[in-house]
Amino acid sequence: MIIELAKNYGFCFGVKRAIKKAEQIKDAATIGPLIHNNEEISRLQKNFNVKTLENIKSLSNETKAIIRTHGITKQDLEELRKKDIEIFDATCPFVTKPQQICEQMSKEGYEIVIFGDENHPEVKGVKSYVNTKAYVVLDKKELQNIKLPSKIAVVSQTTKKPEHFMEIVNFLMLKAKEVRVFNTICDATFKNQDAIKELSLKSDVMVVVGGKNSANTKQLFLIAKTNCEDSYLIETEEELKKEWFLDKKHCGISAGASTPDWIIQKVIAKIENFGIN
């Protein structure tokens, strides 16, 4: 059986940057998980004493706080700045961009449409920078019964599929006099999604490695599943089952943006150890 890695996969720029910061800073607390990968979070805590707190209220004797890659709300940032604590911002620049856009556009009188998951920490943070009105949607149908203003700015969660974002944009173009469109989808998302689409079309089994609470990993899995019925989403090599690979000729592997290479290599090694010819 051939085992093939996607052309683009794994750690993105923003995650690499955040991990490096955390390793250098040490002995700190992150407000929410730094990234969406439990294994890497555990490694940071064990080796660098970087612990994860649920929220700002959980801070007690910590002297250093790291802002997660997904960012935090404007209100939480203001509260954090009032505390006697050193702040290190590991927010991905691709996430900071829609925050800045929303703040500026709402100052100019635009209402904001955010294409994304309202419960995702990134979207919560972006929405908090809107000073007018914000509509968070996952489907254009959610906009049909809303009385939309004449001036709209639209942004996307960084990990969403571009074609779905364009469905929202096309709908808004027919409804509002002025629509400002900002492409806030991360280019790593484009590359990883294109790569897994290509690989899944020629594979008869796919393994996607990443946190099951990771939005970009779930998107990769959905693309794989669309093209390859026998697709599996796992966090570690412990979840692999030999029967998945019996009678298979081509195994494709991809990984979410928060998945470190050391986990991916463990997955590959275990599949090889199954001895499927």
UniProtKB/Swiss-Prot annotation:
Organism: Campylobacter jejuni subsp. doylei (strain ATCC BAA-1458 / RM4099 / 269.97)
Gene name of the record: ispH
UniProt-listed Pfam families: LYTB
Name of this chain's protein: 4-hydroxy-3-methylbut-2-enyl diphosphate reductase
Cofactor binding notes: Binds 1 [4Fe-4S] cluster per subunit.
CDD domains hit by this protein: lytB_ispH (cd13944)
Enzyme class: oxidoreductase
Active-site annotation: E122
GO molecular function ontology, one term from the record: 4 iron, 4 sulfur cluster binding
